Curated annotation (Swiss-Prot):
HAMAP family the record matches: CinA_B
PANTHER family registered for this protein in UniProt: NICOTINAMIDE-NUCLEOTIDE AMIDOHYDROLASE PNCC (PTHR13939), NMN AMIDOHYDROLASE-LIKE PROTEIN YFAY (PTHR13939:SF0)
UniProt xrefs under InterPro entries: CinA, CinA-like_C, CinA_C, CinA_KH, Competence-induced_CinA, MoaB/Mog-like_dom_sf, MoaB/Mog_dom
UniProt lineage: Bacteria, Pseudomonadati, Thermodesulfobacteriota, Syntrophobacteria, Syntrophobacterales
Residue runs in coiled coils: none
Protein's UniProt name: CinA-like protein
Organism: Syntrophobacter fumaroxidans (strain DSM 10017 / MPOB)
Amino acid sequence: MDERPPEISGSLLTIGDEILLGDILNGNARHIALELRNRGFRLDRMITVGDREEDIVSSLVLCLADARFIIVTGGLGPTDDDRTNAAVSRAFDRPLVADEAYVGRLKERLAERGQAWSNEVAKMAELPAGAVKIGLDMAGFFIDHGNVPCYFLPGVPGEMKFLLAEVVIPDLARRFPLRGAYLKEVVRVQGMVESEVNRRLRDLDCRRIGVEIGYLPQGSENWVTLFAVAASEEECRTRIEKVREEVVARLGEKHISGRNDECLEKVVGERLRERGWRMAAAESCTGGLLSTRLTSIAGSSDYFDRAFITYSNQAKQDHLGVSEEMLRVHGAVSEPVALAMAEGACRGARVEVALGITGIAGPAGGSAEKPVGTVCIACVTPKEKRVEKHRFEGVRESIRQSAAQAALLLLWRVLTDDSNLHCR
């Protein structure tokens, strides 16, 4: 196959005590890995260290041993715990030298804000000898060390993303030109655990076709990722289509909800639009999460009419027509009440489709009969009524998110079964 040699791979080093302490998620690492992969590059190593200079030095030395390129984020600021510049100076054996252009720009910015120059700010402009400043209005520099391009980016996500897109990836593409094309596709799988997905696809000989396959759980979904590098985009697409057909055949078309960015809320919206149906949502424990997801899709006003956030029993009676007797006999968290909520939303909004959600998100409110995590979901269409009862585990927010996802999945199943329309 005509493709970039497989040894062109790099290392990523993310720096910050706040990551190791769990104060923030390492979103920078995820973003960088995805952007590189989507452009035909690969990471063979990903390291996260705290702010201790010795740890940064040893990690840089390790990366230099075999990486074809290195990306580092964090530790470029003016505070005492920003030690990346000093660590690079030691690891690369390059003295720190003031970058006069950067010094001038920093002084201009401070003057604009009415702030004085300080040793702390001056530290930001002391770069390892031979470093090339990137992003004059933000921290960041580049070093070509022994023919290994090394990119040092700020930890601030917005600044990191800008420099990655505008400087790093274009420079990597120039240094390591892709001989051909690359293509990635995600197949979204519903209603099947990751282990079962893997079992059904285990002996699928993708490499013979020239496609790499991966598995990624995403909440209640499982993503099957297909990646191809070939002489042309058409050849990439042909290879991926061949593997995708086998993936769908082995998993079953009823489990495939979409591809790439075709999230459930987008897919169900397309189904509703195709049928000419409008919908409403009646939410209790989710408090609007379901409606937020449905209306996050551009053009959702074509099919989404309104939401009823009926948290209390009285609200369920007043706005959805749920009877006091039903609430007394079955309780607010029950399949009959979920169905009554959906039916009431249909009547109140004068729409064809509605979802009703009621549950116990916790941490209090559970019982032996209805423990925390119990959620009842109903879907009503002109052709059928369907109700499900779930028991989700986790903290309050994860239960609420799981309930909203389960409601979307129920709606997708109902609309798919009804219309016999499947992922293309």
